[in-house]
Amino acid sequence: MPRVAVLLPARDAARTVRAAAASILRQTERDLALVCVDDGSTDGTSEILVRLAERDRRVTVIRGPGQGIARALALGLDRCDADVVARMDADDVSHPRRLALQLEALEAEPALAAVGARVRLFPRRHVRGGMVRYAAWLNGLTTPGDVERDLLVESPLVHPAAAIRRTALQAAGGWREGPFPEDYDLWLRLAERGGRLTNLPPLLLDWRDSPRRLTRTDPRYALERHVALKCAFLARGPLARRREVALWGAGRTGKAFADALLARGVSVGLFVDVDRRKIGRTLRGAPVVGPGEVGRARGLPLLVAVGAPGARRLIRAELSRAGFRELRDYRCVA
């Protein structure tokens, strides 16, 4: 049995899959299996993968039904005969020591369910502001505590940079198909079961950005789908016995959270916002107050739902001055 099985789904990736697979087969950790799922390609991807398998016995090729990444991953997982399952995408490039360092981290810390790594976006001509901010935020999450604090801000691990303990993956139910991002759904379920998540400080993946990225084109990655996932997590855990919360943020994101929480029987008793046009009014039946009155939120779980660049840092500082403690009194959810 290999030390790690790398699961690589591919669909119409003939231009990039050879380099992606080569970056795995050239890892300093040689004791690996590469499980490739050709998910209904029509551009020659399958032929490229078959030739790789003919040259390297560590490569297995499976034909998928072309029904999406979650099903392809579930199909491939059945062929991953290793204690650690690592992910790889067909258009990215892993750095040579990626798997060795991730295996070392998982062996050193049994509480870790999954470990990612810092990433570098490429090619530069396609990289846009939102992805730059996301990568900078994610690259700052290099301890389990960092990830726990920011778990509900965004997906805290890059899927193709992750290595997952197989026992934790199976206990969480593996990858699920649904109207949500399958990777973030998995991270939340791993955390819900007590698994710790982190990213290694070294840069270990070149992560391709392109106008066709699913996060830009697939409705499963829309704001409302992320909010629904987060609220489901909150309702099962931190808010399981609560029927009212306070929300910092009366904009689009705050409203989305208010609606998603109400659908789960949790109402908003107070909104906090810096916009003077909103202060003094009501929203979803709750008063909107300024930051100076955040003390009115005491006794209620406070969710910070402001995604504007730089806002989270300022709000954390304001709440610290007001005596609020993160994860005990409030959580950032955007």
Question: Could you tell me what each predicted segment is?
Answer:
Residues A22-D31:
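Short, acidic, metal-binding catalytic loop of nucleotide-sugar glycosyltransferases
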Residues I69-L77, L101-A105, E109-A168:
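Flexible acidic/His/Gly-enriched loops in nucleotide-sugar-dependent glycosyltransferase catalytic domains
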Residues V85:
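Short aromatic/hydrophobic "clamp" motif used to bind/position activated sugar donors
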Residues F180-L186:
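Acidic donor-binding loop at a coil-to-helix junction in glycosyltransferase catalytic cores
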